[in-house]
Amino acid sequence: MKTEFAIWLVSYLIRRGPDTQENIINEWSKYINEDVEIHRNTFGNYRKKAEELFGTEISYNPGTKEYYIEDKDLITHNAMYRWLLQSVSASNVI
């Protein structure tokens, strides 16, 4: 689940923009069609996995309590990363 969540998280933040951890987890629950609770530390581990997979930083704004990807172009202009994100989008439709 860690890798799947990591890929989904990057896709979500690119599509939706900055969002809170609570909203992100709610959207993940809808995506997998299952109620889940993700502890703050677990979320942090998943976030780090996403950063490792995509070679980017998922930043946090303490003022708004939102996570975001500052340099989306780094991901969207890389063919392999685009393929990963498109795979997630395609499975979301199915």
Predicted regions and their residues:
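Short, basic/aromatic recognition patches that contact phosphate-bearing ligands
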Residues: 1-90
